[in-house]
Amino acid sequence: MFQGFLDDTVQFLIDLKFHNNSTFFHENHDRYVESVQVPFYEMIEELAPQMKKIDPQMETRPYKCISRIHRDTRFSKDKSPYRDHHWFLFRRAGESRDKSLFYYFEFGPDRLSWGMGIWGENRELMDYFRKKMRANPESILQLLESIQLSEHCLIPSGSVFKRMEVPDEIPEELRRWYTAKELYVEKYKPAWKTAFSENIVKVVSDDFIALAPLYRLLRGYADEIHPKG
């Protein structure tokens, strides 16, 4: 059962940042498993039943959800072989990560965040979302208001088209959503110490449940664009 992240979860990731080489990692592999991998796996497993309720096709196997500790350095100036943080994603099984719709959680010595959104820029899906907003702005606004984002300290984030023309029928409250180039909703400045309590599972789960109507809306749009035969 997940009891919160450990002090050594953070200490190991700090040590790895300053000794980012295969010798250190291999010598401390058991410590990595015990202090980092196991707590992440336990948290994923506790969230999994709720994620299946949100979308029965959601991938919830921990080894499929968690980020790799090894970095892909092929196209990066930073050649450090290991990450100094971890994240996990819940998305539909078998879907490519790029442009996918997903829930996420991220934790490390200098970060704590979670939310839901689209990985990278998905112009096709966002254009379809804009089309739906133009057709029925009040319905979209009503759904977003029902989520009560501010009560959950959740905020829309991601880059926007600064020069995109917004039709008159789009209300002010939807303009941020309408002009989105990238779109995700994230927890606003969660208290870092929350990660060390078992209660974080409930906090994250409650936010994921709150975001379910938006996830299902966008999921439905994605399925309309690319129906499966």
Name these PLM-found stretches.
Residues 1-23, 195-198, 221-228:
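Short, charged, low-complexity amphipathic alpha-helix
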Residues 172-229:
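Charge-rich, low-complexity terminal tails
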Residues 109-169:
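Compact, glycine/acidic-enriched structural inserts
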Residues 17-52, 206-228:
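Contiguous, amphipathic alpha-helical segments that mediate oligomerization or scaffolding
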Residues 33-78:
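Gly/Pro-rich turn-and-neighbor structural signature
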Residues 74-134:
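Aromatic- and glycine-enriched beta-alpha-beta binding-site module
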Residues 29-36, 118, 129-133, 196-200:
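Short histidine-centered catalytic/ligand-binding loop motif
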Residues 69, 87, 162-175:
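Aromatic/basic-lined ligand-recognition segments
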